[in-house]
């Protein structure tokens, strides 16, 4: 089967928070263009990991409807600005960023004091304006994740009650479009051409996003390559009957009956269950009285009844 080719035919990275690329994948079999395009679009939008500010703590503020003296924006507006800040974290652990600014000044993302594992994508991104004599002191939690996390879920996972939770958007891919064209070369069988457009927030390039999405799909389908259709042993997960493992000493038999069973290599109740009442009489020196004793002991102590019929495996 011939492999398709992928080509980036257009790319625009002029804006730090808006990267765009257009890809062409061809040739694909009829119908595969929609299949591949839809799968890639879904993974690009929902399964790629990104970074977001998930909570903030502002000095002197206890709720999001408060104001900070000397700051033009109220707390709710500051939270909304922090929600829009584009960051990239190289750590799987939550990180803490800090901000301490005195007015008068215009605060941007360049004022952030960030851990070495975190970088800001656009240092010019606006946060707030402070007047003369004003001061803004803030800590904010930075996390990696997928998709969208609500405030309610953030509160459930929060480790500090004085942080104000934020609806967090982790998705590094902002938008995906795809279309399928029919192509035919020299009168051959028509094929599909997939045109895929990807917009990202700058924390990842469209090429990196597409590669990651393809890797996720490969990992998802890879186990299907080695499907085993052999029947499984339905009894393998059934635990052994603990009663069957009881030694025959627990039956408190007479010495004669006990010794006869031991010489016949009957050491547990499980061994006894291989016998019928008639089979017991075939054991050397094991008479009718001993057989009745064993049958009665099994019934009385364990509620087990040996069948009467002669077994074909003990002759």
From Swiss-Prot:
The lineage of its organism: Bacteria, Bacillati, Cyanobacteriota, Cyanophyceae, Nostocales. The keyword Transcription applies. The N-terminal domain is essential for RNAP assembly and basal transcription, whereas the C-terminal domain is involved in interaction with transcriptional regulators and with upstream promoter elements. The gene is rpoA. Residues 243-315 are annotated as: Alpha C-terminal domain (alpha-CTD). The keyword Nucleotidyltransferase applies. Keywords: DNA-directed RNA polymerase, Nucleotidyltransferase, Transcription, Transferase. It catalyses: RNA(n) + a ribonucleoside 5'-triphosphate = RNA(n+1) + diphosphate. DNA-dependent RNA polymerase catalyzes the transcription of DNA into RNA using the four ribonucleoside triphosphates as substrates. Belongs to the RNA polymerase alpha chain family. It comes from Nostoc sp. (strain PCC 7120 / SAG 25.82 / UTEX 2576). HAMAP family: RNApol_bact_RpoA. Its EC number is 2.7.7.6. One of its GO terms (cellular component) is DNA-directed RNA polymerase complex. SUPFAM superfamilies: C-terminal domain of RNA polymerase alpha subunit, Insert subdomain of RNA polymerase alpha subunit, RBP11-like subunits of RNA polymerase. GO terms for molecular function: DNA binding; DNA-directed RNA polymerase activity; protein dimerization activity. Homodimer. In cyanobacteria the RNAP catalytic core is composed of 2 alpha, 1 beta, 1 beta', 1 gamma and 1 omega subunit. When a sigma factor is associated with the core the holoenzyme is formed, which can initiate transcription. This is DNA-directed RNA polymerase subunit alpha. It holds the Pfam family RNA_pol_A_bac. GO terms for biological process: DNA-templated transcription. Residues 1-228 are annotated as: Alpha N-terminal domain (alpha-NTD). InterPro entries: DNA-dir_RNA_pol_insert, DNA-dir_RNA_pol_RpoA/D/Rpb3, DNA-dir_RpoA, RBP11-like, RNAP_asu_C, RNApol_insert_sf.
């Amino acid at each position: 089967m011939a492999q398709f080719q992928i080509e980036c035919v257009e790319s625009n990275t002029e804006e730090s928070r808006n990267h765009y690329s257009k890809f062409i994948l061809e040739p694909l079999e009829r119908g595969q263009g929609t299949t591949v395009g839809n799968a890639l679009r879904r993974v690009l939008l929902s399964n790629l990991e990104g970074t977001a500010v998930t909570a903030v703590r502002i000095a002197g503020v206890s709720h999001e409807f408060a104001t900070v003296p000397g700051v033009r924006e109220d707390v709710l507006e500051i939270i909304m600005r922090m929600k829009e800040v584009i960051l990239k974290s190289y750590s799987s652990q939550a990180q803490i960023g800090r901000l301490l600014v005195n007015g008068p000044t215009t605060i941007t993302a360049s004022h952030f004091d960030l851990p070495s594992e975190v970088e800001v994508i656009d240092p010019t991104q606006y946060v707030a304006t402070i007047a003369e004599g004003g001061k803004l002191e803030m800590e904010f939690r930075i996390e990696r994740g997928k998709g969208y996390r609500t405030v309610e879920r953030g509160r459930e996972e929060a480790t500090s009650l004085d942080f104000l939770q934020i609806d967090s958007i982790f998705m590094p891919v902002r938008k995906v479009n795809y279309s399928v064209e029919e192509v035919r070369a020299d009168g051959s069988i028509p094929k599909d051409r997939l045109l895929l457009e990807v917009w990202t927030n700058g924390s990842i390039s469209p090429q990196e996003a597409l590669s990651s999405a393809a890797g996720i799909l490969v990992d998802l389908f890879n186990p299907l390559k080695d499907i085993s259709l052999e029947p499984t042993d339905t009894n393998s997960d059934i635990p052994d009957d603990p009663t069957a493992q009881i030694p025959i000493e627990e039956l408190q038999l007479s010495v004669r009956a006990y010794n006869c069973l031991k010489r016949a290599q009957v050491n547990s109740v499980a061994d006894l269950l291989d016998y019928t009442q008639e089979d017991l009489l075939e054991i050397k020196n094991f008479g009718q009285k001993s057989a009745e004793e064993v049958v009665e002991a099994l019934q009385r102590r364990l509620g087990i009844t040996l069948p009467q019929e002669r077994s074909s495996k003990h002759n």
